[in-house]
Amino acid sequence: MSNNTSNKAIPYKIYLHESEMPTHYYNVRADMKKKPAPLVNPATGKPVSFDDLKPVFCDELIEQELNDTDRYIEIPQEIRDFYKMYRPSPLVRAYCLEEKLQTPAKIYYKFEGNNTSGSHKLNSAIAQAYYAKKEGLKGVTTETGAGQWGTALSMACSYFGLDCNVYMVKVSYEQKPFRREVMRTYGASVTPSPSETTEIGKKILSEHPGTTGSLGCAISEAVEAATTTEGYKYVLGSVLNQVLLHQSIIGEEAMAAMKKYDIKPDIIIGCAGGGSNVGGLMSPFMGEKLRGEADYRFIAVEPASCPSLTRGRYAYDFCDTGRVCPMAKMYTLGSGYIPAPNHAGGLRYHGMSPIVSELYHQGEMEAVSYTQTEVFEAARDFARVEGILPAPESSHAIKAAIDEALKCKETGEEKTILFGLTGTGYFDLYAYEKFNDGLMSDYIPSDEEIEASLATLPNIEG
């Protein structure tokens, strides 16, 4: 057996005390010698200014978006008070998984599913709702894929007394009706996207009748709704710098918990859709690496059906299908790319966080992709030994962690692996049913499909 199960110096779960929770967000851009390229205004072709973003975002969030010099940004007390309802989240030693794999590797996961939204998304939702309330807004609009972000934002808006209008990718809206009902219970209105309620929604429906939607399309609708409705601004759950900033609390807590027991991870793994989770988990560790204080190996894991990092191009592209948002330099499959309706709805995004993209481009991190069948096999195996039913998104990281642990089994190396378990899969049982019935299909886009989508990239130097 790989571990002595009777006498463990490291507990199954490491919890920080409330007094040890982070008081500041960590801004990894401050430690990046080559900063992520700026967002570009599609109308002018120039880097966006504060005034360009003001019609769309809250003022303080714009400040955070554009700030690439301050290493630490204080977390307001009101946000910290809310965090205490479900944070600090546990750092779990996966002893049972290690036993099953018979690996000398030591596996840890940071579990972010201990709240009603079922994921890490609440970390940024409460921050964005706080700044919207502080600005005196009536409400906010947003998009959601699998529904975790929409659920998190509906909770945050309910807490601060804000309206919450959610555009939910149609395939998830249909597959996950109960996620929709959680949002409605918290007072949100939920619209399947693309819809007939916005001009861009009507356009996409006319061009792609019967489409199951995409995150890029839902973003376009949410932005249009915000900019055409008095007293509303747009907020989003991934991709942008401000979101990765808020999510840095995951990595900060993980690092503090590990240091309590003198644990140093060799490999840090996160699933990657828009980059909020992998960016949040890795950023404090990446900061140490960039400052030359420590060395780590970082792995971003994405679905083979939406392989932005592993098969995309590093270029300026629109963040949304309707091309109403600023352009970002990122790894992208093209803003018109609509992936096959796989079950990891939260990873069905054509692009990637500019921060994650730049770090990947510099060779500071790696990326791998998996088909959904092999991801669900890992999810099942994990659930059976660790007692948590993982979200499909999180299960991409589980699969990569298992693969790395099995490599250690072959080599005999005692590496320490840390991965992000972003949330639970209780609302993803339609997907689990397909997997259990042997009806799950794996779709991998052809080179021709990806090239056709990339051919529509805007011609912007950068």
Language-model features, listed with the residues they occupy:
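Claisen-condensing/thiolase-fold acyl-transfer catalytic domains that form or cleave C-C bonds
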Residues: 272-280, 372-437
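A short, small-residue-rich loop immediately preceding and capping a beta-strand
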Residues: 124, 132-171, 264-278, 298, ...
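Positively charged, low-complexity intrinsically disordered leader regions
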Residues: 3-137
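Active-site/ligand-binding loops adjacent to catalytic centers
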Residues: 72-74, 204-242, 250, 262, ...
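Active-site-proximal loop->helix
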Residues: 141, 149-212, 308-318, 429-437
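Alpha-helix C-terminal capping segments
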Residues: 127-137, 151-163, 184-185, 282-292, ...
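Active-site nucleophile and cofactor-binding loops and adjacent substrate-binding regions
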Residues: 111-124, 140-150, 240-243, 269-274, ...
